[in-house]
Amino acid sequence: MPQRLQILYNTVIVPKLQKELGYTNIHQVPRLEKIVINRGLGEASQNAKALESSIAEISAITGQRPVITRAKKAIASFKIRKGMPVGLMVTLRRERMYAFLDRLINVALPRIRDFRGVSPKAFDGRGNYTLGIREQLIFPEINYDSVDQLRGMDISIVTTAKTDEEGRALLKAFGMPFAS
């Protein structure tokens, strides 16, 4: 079943951006490709409970089980051996991607303390946007009492936009609250 933002994109955003950016074909209009959520876990190598609680939190937030990322090589100063778990990653596409973006923009970001908007400078030069979140409590799926430690995450929104301006126009049309 199509999500609210997916219907908004197809009915309102595509014609608006097509006119605004001067495209002749609707397939030239930038669209969301995927959303990648990444969490680095430095303490996971010593604490297996931290890894399990992080898996449960990210599964609750995204509705999808994360992949455990492992160390590619040993680093003695960090007490990490090759193959040890060092983080978690989830790639969201299609309906889950639109559902997550909807919750992020309309529910989670407004719950951040002293929130004045996200940085308009966090684009990578190719129209993709990356956002860092310091604590997982901004998501309503996380129960405050079950959190043992505040952990952040990186959210990368990958678009088919060719420039940062196109990517910014797309995310602004979705309702992303950029700081002025």
Curated annotation (Swiss-Prot):
One of its GO terms (molecular function) is tRNA binding. It comes from the Bacteria. Signal peptide: none annotated. The keyword Ribosomal protein applies. Keywords: Ribonucleoprotein, Ribosomal protein, RNA-binding, rRNA-binding, tRNA-binding. InterPro entries: Ribosomal_uL5, Ribosomal_uL5_bac-type, Ribosomal_uL5_C, Ribosomal_uL5_CS, Ribosomal_uL5_dom_sf, Ribosomal_uL5_N. GO terms for biological process: translation. GO terms for cellular component: ribonucleoprotein complex; ribosome. The keyword RNA-binding applies. PANTHER family: 60S RIBOSOMAL PROTEIN L11-RELATED. Part of the 50S ribosomal subunit; part of the 5S rRNA/L5/L18/L25 subcomplex. Contacts the 5S rRNA and the P site tRNA. Forms a bridge to the 30S subunit in the 70S ribosome. Belongs to the universal ribosomal protein uL5 family. This is one of the proteins that bind and probably mediate the attachment of the 5S RNA into the large ribosomal subunit, where it forms part of the central protuberance. In the 70S ribosome it contacts protein S13 of the 30S subunit (bridge B1b), connecting the 2 subunits; this bridge is implicated in subunit movement. Contacts the P site tRNA; the 5S rRNA and some of its associated proteins might help stabilize positioning of ribosome-bound tRNAs. This is Large ribosomal subunit protein uL5.
